[in-house]
Design a protein with these regions (language model features):
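Structural signature of tandem-repeat unit edges
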Residues: 40-49, 64-77, 88-103, 115-129, ...
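Extracytoplasmic cysteine-anchoring/structural motifs
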Residues: 1-13
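N-terminal low-complexity/intrinsically disordered extensions
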Residues: 351, 360, 364-365
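Consensus positions within tandem repeat domains that build extended binding/scaffold surfaces
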Residues: 109-113, 131-136, 154-159, 177-182, ...
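Surface-exposed repetitive/solenoidal architectures
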Residues: 15-86, 96, 106, 113, ...
Length: 416
């Protein structure tokens, strides 16, 4: 979109095999312009390089909406410095062709940290790492195309890039670090590589993701990765995943579908808290524990079948549309408010011969909206035990019945 008016000095440049040339809208020169730069293309020939001092001068002399093209220049080192930090006049930049990494940064700095009007960046093939805070709070950055050579991404690299819509992470990358795309609210599409092994905490928190497939190679996912992703509807977990961490999908209000990995052992606190559209899930036999509020507020659940020793406090709090709960033989304790506010709960099945201990209000307000019969199915030989230990349940109108006479949903009775 820029018109380059080449003066007679271009002939001089054409005859040289080395040197640095600065092309502006006014023509070609061998010295940097002194007036504020609206457009600048730097070309280096032979063994000549763009010096660190020259780059500093360019960064300090930008006009509003500046476009800087260094794609045909060789920089003095392979490490790009932090001269453009908070340069709000910068609109577009192409990095020098030999850049491999960025200068290490601190919490409040980065190569393009706070370049609020940067809309486009072009990376060279050969770039291997994108550093901490590199493009943090580049609120107008619309797209990035990471070279296939990239292997390392650092924390906060694209934090707060609010207009970024899609990203393809190159094959060879093994770790998504913490906060990488946190608060990229327009980010709807991410492709993860088959080489990926871990995803750091809050990496995609508050993004616009609509669905995500996590590669089978991933064995570690940290907390809050998809927290507050209000548009996220589907997640495909790797089947070998053994732990779903705390707050993973907390407040993902559009989430409807997840798969429970076949080797899953633990689900952390608040992992799916207030996922109000999440449909019924099937827990694998390998499951050992659910932490507090792990499925609290999953109001679209209609049925819960679970068989673990301890059901944590508030684990299924306010699952208001659940009509049946089936507790397996392993269950020994049910925590405080674990199933509180299950107001449409019609049947509870508990297969343990010894009545599990109940925390305060474990089934508080259960079945409060049920107009017909409410039944507590238990082993016939354990009636006395449940009558004594589960008075908080029977006092809410649940009648004890033999588990062997439990009625199927189609109205047919079966013998267990």
């Amino acid at each position: 979109g820029h018109t380059l008016r080449l003066s007679t000095q271009i002939a001089k440049a054409d005859c040289k095999s080395s040197g640095a040339f600065f092309m502006t809208e006014a023509g070609v020169a061998e010295e940097l312009p002194t007036e504020p730069i609206g457009y600048l293309k730097v070309v280096t020939l032979g063994e000549s390089t763009l010096s660190a001092e020259e780059l500093t001068s360019i960064a300090g002399n930008l006009a509003n909406g500046a476009v800087i093209d260094l794609g045909e220049a060789t920089f003095a080192t392979t490490e790009f410095p932090m001269d453009f930090t908070r340069k709000t006049n910068l609109q577009e930049i192409a990095l020098p062709r030999n850049i491999q990494t960025f200068t290490p940064s601190t919490y409040n700095s980065g190569a393009f940290y706070g370049c609020e009007n940067l809309t486009r960046v072009t990376f060279p093939e050969g770039l291997t790492a994108i550093g901490q805070n590199c493009f943090r709070n580049c609120a107008k950055l619309e797209s990035i195309e990471l070279p296939s050579s990239v292997r390392t991404l650092d924390i906060y690299a694209f934090y707060g890039c609010k207009l970024l819509t899609s990203v393809v992470i190159p094959e060879g990358v093994e770790a998504i670090p913490r906060f990488l795309f946190d608060s990229c609210t327009a980010l709807t599409d991410v492709t993860l590589p088959s080489t990926l092994k871990s995803i750091g905490a809050e990496a995609f928190e508050a993004t616009g993701l609509e669905e995500i497939t996590i590669p089978e190679s991933v064995t570690t996912i940290e907390s809050s990765v998809f927290k507050n992703c209000k548009s996220l509807e589907r997640i495909q977990f790797p089947d070998a995943l053994t732990a779903i961490p705390a707050n993973l999908c907390n407040a993902c209000s559009a989430l409807t579908t997840i798969n429970m990995p076949s080797k899953l052992e633990t689900v952390g606190n608040d992992a799916f808290y207030n996922c109000g559209k999440l449909q019924d899930v099937t827990f694998p036999e390998t499951l050992k524990s659910l932490d507090e509020r792990s499925f609290g507020g999953c109001s679209a659940f209609t049925r819960i079948i679970i068989d673990i020793p301890a059901i944590a406090n508030y684990a299924f709090w306010n699952c208001a549309n659940v009509t049946s709960i089936d507790l397996g033989e392993k269950v020994t304790s049910i925590g405080r408010n674990a199933f509180i506010s299950a107001s449409n709960l019609q049947t509870i099945t508990c297969r343990a011969e010894n009545a599990p201990s109940l925390g305060n209000s474990a089934f508080g307000s259960a079945g409060s909206k049920v107009e017909g019969a409410k039944i507590l199915y238990v082993p016939a030989a354990s009636y006395d035990t449940y009558e004594t230990a589960w008075t908080d349940v029977t006092s809410q109108g649940y009648a004890l019945q033999d588990i062997n006479d439990q009625q199927l949903t189609d109205g047919i009775y079966y013998r267990a």
